[in-house]
């Protein structure tokens, strides 16, 4: 029973780190990346569709993204969606493809992005700690109900803390790599 609680908390912590990495992929670092466009949705055919399902997104150069829609009639809608995504880029529509030059980041913008990355990472750390707290609360409830012993509760608390420390260390490592990526471009 307590193993199920531990496993559940471990999975939630793992998902938190995965979500952090996905969110970091959305931060523009001055280098072209197709991940910047993963969350963009385009209004077409009466519904909102992910951009990557409507077009081929390629990176021919370090600071250039080319979006080649499978249906050329969607060029204007895709261009509009990219502008609305607030990525601080200006798409150029040549009638066949959309080219997006990724401008180099200014020093101020780099600092802002690094600050934003720290905030995102801190939110992930808080989330991991909350998962630990919930797991410990659940274990205490099991002990109170007589389903586990006090020794098992102490062992579970230690396991939750160990998992928390490991996932926070991973969050810190991911943050450090992202900050380095932001500051070196």
UniProtKB/Swiss-Prot annotation:
<dbReference type="Pfam" id="PF01765">
    <property type="entry name" value="RRF"/>
</dbReference>
<dbReference type="InterPro" id="IPR002661">
    <property type="entry name" value="Ribosome_recyc_fac"/>
</dbReference>
<dbReference type="GO" id="GO:0005737">
    <property type="term" value="C:cytoplasm"/>
</dbReference>
<keyword id="KW-0648">Protein biosynthesis</keyword>
<dbReference type="InterPro" id="IPR036191">
    <property type="entry name" value="RRF_sf"/>
</dbReference>
<dbReference type="GO" id="GO:0043023">
    <property type="term" value="F:ribosomal large subunit binding"/>
</dbReference>
<dbReference type="GO" id="GO:0006415">
    <property type="term" value="P:translational termination"/>
</dbReference>
<dbReference type="InterPro" id="IPR023584">
    <property type="entry name" value="Ribosome_recyc_fac_dom"/>
</dbReference>
<protein>
    <recommendedName>
        <fullName>Ribosome-recycling factor</fullName>
    </recommendedName>
</protein>
<comment type="similarity">
    <text>Belongs to the RRF family.</text>
</comment>
<keyword id="KW-0963">Cytoplasm</keyword>
<comment type="function">
    <text>Responsible for the release of ribosomes from messenger RNA at the termination of protein biosynthesis. May increase the efficiency of translation by recycling ribosomes from one round of translation to another.</text>
</comment>
């Amino acid at each position: 029973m307590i193993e199920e609680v531990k496993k559940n908390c471990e999975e939630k912590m793992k998902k938190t780190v995965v979500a952090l990495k996905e969110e970091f992929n959305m931060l523009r670092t001055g280098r072209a990346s197709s991940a910047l466009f993963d969350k963009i949705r385009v209004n077409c055919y009466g519904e909102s569709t992910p951009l990557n399902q409507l077009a081929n997104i390629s990176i021919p150069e370090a600071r250039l993204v080319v979006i080649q829609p499978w249906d050329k009639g969607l060029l204007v809608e895709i261009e509009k969606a990219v502008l609305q995504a607030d990525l601080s880029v200006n798409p150029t529509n040549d009638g066949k493809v959309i080219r997006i030059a990724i401008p180099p980041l200014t020093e101020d913008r780099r600092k802002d992005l690094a600050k934003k990355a720290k905030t995102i990472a801190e939110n992930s750390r808080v989330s991991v700690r909350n998962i630990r707290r919930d797991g410990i609360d659940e274990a205490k409830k099991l002990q109170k109900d007589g389903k586990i012993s006090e020794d098992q509760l102490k062992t579970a608390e230690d396991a939750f803390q160990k998992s928390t420390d490991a996932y926070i260390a991973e969050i810190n490592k991911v943050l450090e790599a992202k900050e380095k990526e932001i500051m070196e471009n």
